[in-house]
């Protein structure tokens, strides 16, 4: 089993990440839709510009996340890094996120101007396929 291939598959198939930010020494976790760019090793997500997440990330861009398993599996990816506002417009990531989470299009259509795209550049991640199948991969 090639765990790098499994990483790519999980990032392609799973629709959401549980994203953890920090504020005043406390973690805050939210579920967000995401898109993973295999060439740039970047995770993209969007949030509303008036969301507390924006304030938290401006004060401390350090994050951690885990993909949210689906289809009765426990396989997932977990990673940490820094989330920064993306130079890409929301329109640049919409199609890729909608391919995984079709209802995201409704949000973009209704309030796209209020969404800020963020990116997380990965340097390493842990891939967990099962209790005995896991590995740390470095990009």
Task: Go through the PLM ranges and name each one.
Residues 21-23, 68-70, 106-113:
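A short, aromatic/hydrophobic, helix- or strand-capping loop or linear motif
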Residues 13-18, 99-103:
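Short Pro/Gly-enriched beta-strand edge/turn motifs at strand-loop
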Residues 1-5, 50-53, 101-103:
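Charged, amphipathic alpha-helical segments
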């Amino acid at each position: 089993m090639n765990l790098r291939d499994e990483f790519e598959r999980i990032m392609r198939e799973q629709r959401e990440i549980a994203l953890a930010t920090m504020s005043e020494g406390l973690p805050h976790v939210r579920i967000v839709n995401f898109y993973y760019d295999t060439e740039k090793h970047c995770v993209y997500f969007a949030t509303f510009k008036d969301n507390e997440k924006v304030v938290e990330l401006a004060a401390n861009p350090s994050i951690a996340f885990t993909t949210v398993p689906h289809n009765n599996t426990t396989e997932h990816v977990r990673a940490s890094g820094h989330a920064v506002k993306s130079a890409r417009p929301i329109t640049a990531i919409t199609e890729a996120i909608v391919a995984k989470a079709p209802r995201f299009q409704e949000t973009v259509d209704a309030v796209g101007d209020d969404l800020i795209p963020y990116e997380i550049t990965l340097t390493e991640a842990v891939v967990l396929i099962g209790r005995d199948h896991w590995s740390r991969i470095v990009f």
